[in-house]
Amino acid sequence: MIEFKNVSKSYSNGTKALDGVNLRIEQGEFVFIVGDSGAGKSTLLKIMMREEVASEGSVVIKNRSLNTMKKRDIPYFRRHLGIVFQDFRLIPNMTVYDNVAFAMRVIGAKEKKISNRVPHVLGRVGLAEKAKCLPNELSGGEQQRVALARAIVNNADIIIADEPTGNVDSKRSFEIVEMLNQINASGTTVIMVTHSEELVRRFGRRIITIKDGKIVSDDISNISVEPIADSQVFGDLDIASKRAIREADEFIRNYNSTIEDITPEQQGGETDEQ
């Protein structure tokens, strides 16, 4: 459960990014967050990730107060989160395999466990044959799949996706959101920021609209109780990719680990593994 009560956020330059936000997201929901650039969407996500702290009000996630959370506890809290960014944030000198494995290594997972899980995860997102590729050898859609695999390899309770379709075409956008849809079907909470009206309209989920730092609309009338047919979303997407998407919810049930911060030192190749 995620709960914001009367949350405001002001920066040192006087900018008020959030103003009296009240919000409750239950475990297992899929929520789209929409709004113009500068509306406050990114600040909302940063507070959820504990990158920022509310100036006023209270924030509780998974029964933990983020306002009073100690710095040493933040990495452990973030292990419950899987983050998917618009710009992918893959480590350029690491292969696809190692980018996903890195999420496990930073929490001290054993190499045997990693060598079993990562190929399985990559297979489920349709990238088994790309395991040895570097990020610059992949298309935008493939890079975003790697980012998604990295976010869910440790079975996060909450997926936070910040414009995950911003750098891919329409067809791949639907593919990525349908993957998130299937992950959500297994009980994972998904929060996705998007500017795409087409995606929001097509996927029939709760829509929270932010304007000038305030929630101006929280619409559940768009929620669909019927699954979306493959032909509506994927068109002529190949069968293997469809199968990979349909199986995405299966593999995340099998894992109980979680993800921690990626530090600059770790990006250089160091890990926390003992």
Report the location of each language-model feature:
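A short, proline-enriched helix->beta-strand linker immediately N-terminal to the Walker B motif
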Residues: 153-157
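Short coil-to-helix segment of the ABC ATPase nucleotide-binding domain corresponding to the Q-loop/switch region
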Residues: 94-102
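Helix-to-loop junction immediately C-terminal to a conserved catalytic motif
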Residues: 49
